[in-house]
């Protein structure tokens, strides 16, 4: 296993979500405060400059330990189990514990087997995927051996009391003071009981933001002008958009692409085309998003990022969750109504006689003012474009505001929600989320679907069914893109660009 001298944690293999975790740790630093430390600024940056993925995880693990969180709890915060409310075999108190811990930090996804200590506990554990072997043996003379390979240390079989391997998300540990080995279930039972006050106000928004009474915003010539403005062609509508709503999955085509690179093309190409998707290589395996979807999640969290060093206050604030970051037109309207005065619309268009640079500076300042006034939901919208107002490329707008708010130490107080006419295929959604978007409403894609629905091109499907199938295809595409990078959870992918 990899670890530096003096480390409290070491890992075998790597952390796929390192870039996103590192970026979000900068956001958590903005809220960090504890009476245990005279000057919290002495702990920043938590992740040392130039640190590797294993060193970065060790830095955060150590921070949680010295702030009073025991090693098993810190492990579950950083490298949580894969779990779902649909899992009827999972005890309710375990569900409540996992639900709370998953709402506090972004998971550090492996593949990784880890070992760590806080001088009270010594633990060994696997990440949610369990792709790295971690075997253990307990001897009659009260010794626990754990490692990635059998035969690391010669043991007389007569000494062994029990042995086995840890599965996905499982943990084993020794509480040094008591001289006792705790199994996976015993550790989680202990934590669920010890921290049963973790009754955070987690509110599921899926029941409140239902897909119903879907309507279009634009039609006729107005719709066509907007499609032209955002570079949406008839080919895009027929070969990309239509199959997604009809088949509830991404369109497939023949292999081969002789399209020039966006940077070399003499035709208009949206900013999304200048980005390429990463993929896992060599010892860093991808995930099968179809057969391993139980360990993957698009669950999206809203609400302020709390102080990770103060669990008492973390349990007092409302945390809102959705099962998908993609919102239909009616869902987005309900979303804005739900948050009311806690939301603010940032107009991402600019007059034709202004420069793009000045427009970006303007929306950055608008976002800062809104957050300082107590807004928790920013709505970035290009819907107000007209013959005299041009849209700021939404990818540029989201990235600019996300990085600006981090610089101003305000990002942890707000979610960035996008209402975009550009977003059409899964790649555009993935890049928007990758630069920091919390949710995306592709209003023009839905209006374009309605145009085709009116022409009766979707047969027996209602328009609401077309919308649901389109969102389902986008969700599947996002899971596929994440899985190629070996990332299981959307919150770890978000902001990782």
PLM feature spans:
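Single conserved hydrophobic/aromatic residue that forms the stacking wall/gate
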Residues: 1-6, 11
